[in-house]
Amino acid sequence: IKNKKIFKIDHGIYSDKEIVDPMILFSKKYENSIITMDTAFYFYNLTDIIPDKVYLATNRNSNTIKRENIIQVWVPKEKLNVGKEKIKVNGNTINIYNKERLLVELIRKRNQIPFDYYKEIINNYRKIVDTLDSYKIEQYIALYKNENTLGNIILREVY
């Protein structure tokens, strides 16, 4: 702010930087949303593929976000905040799912994801398996009806 320059980034959002990371921008704009899937996998270095859109989890009763660079993932209210963490990025706080919740989401959506991309992320999870909290994974799996199947796939694919 030395030069007294403030840039309007979006409606109601201003910054001292002309270019703002879309992940940070949309975390500010949609405060109740949570960074998920491809955006979160990239953030955690589980893939080197830079997502061209920001993936945001929102309450399934939320309004549709009408932006072409956002993929909105609707989640039931009772599951939305499970695994949510607040992380500081460049001085800004973002909501993002932890690695354990993302692993469960990855397994749940494995048939909707390109196989090579899925395998890359799974291989990177294998490298960090010792840092994962197994208890959290079990809790997140228990949220879904097919918990035995999900648990078996995670054991087979990652552990």
Protein language model regions, located:
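Nucleic-acid-binding surface
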Residues: I9-Y159
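A short, conserved structural fragment
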Residues: K2-D10
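Short polybasic/polar patches that bind polyanions
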Residues: I1-K2, Y42
